[in-house]
């Protein structure tokens, strides 16, 4: 499965058409938050309508909580707090972020994040249908793609799922675009879509094939 991963468009979709064109023939798009820049929620429809492929989406900390209703009513699949099975790949989503110093609209406590994810990840681990488990979060795990000049700011709750899932696609920290592998888990931050950054991720359903990641700029 070829996945187009985008994050942090912040309501500026001026680069999206070029991103989609350059990505070429992909199977699925995932949008991992900050779809808007504190609203309006109606921007969701504008973004979703740009794709002619399925879209899984979660909100970011700069989205209003009311965006969940807009996502439900859009062409995109609202994956916040939910799981979706596509072939042998289980996608698990949780939007918002761990607490920030800025009191942004969609923040969750570390306890809320852990409680929301544990049941879904455990279910996927115990399912014979899941060849690959993909976690879509806006916030990165603590210690991976989360570094700012003053230290690591990722979620310690999400960190607990490293080595339990195969792939984490996250955003939030604009400066941390890139990928790294911790245990068996590949962590990908596709960069700011509003600046023309994205990532193409290829997941083979056959066992033991490595996850391939290619970053693009337009």
Please state what every model-predicted region is.
Residues 63-157:
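Conserved catalytic scaffold of divalent metal-dependent phosphoesterases
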Residues 51-55, 131, 164-166, 184-185:
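A short helix->loop->beta-strand "cap" motif at the edges of active sites that frequently abuts
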Residues 2-10, 88-97, 134-138, 186-191, ...:
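Active-site-proximal beta-strand elements of phosphoester/diester hydrolases
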Residues 8, 29, 34, 60, ...:
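Divalent metal-coordination and catalytic microenvironments
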Residues 1, 27, 53, 130-132:
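Short coil/turn segments at beta-strand junctions that form active-site/ligand-binding loops
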Residues 15, 84-87, 108, 156-164, ...:
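Binuclear metal-dependent phosphoesterase catalytic core
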Residues 6-86:
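Core catalytic region of metal-dependent phosphoesterases/phosphodiesterases
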Residues 10-15, 36-41, 61-68, 98-102, ...:
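Active-site environment of divalent metal-dependent phosphoester hydrolases
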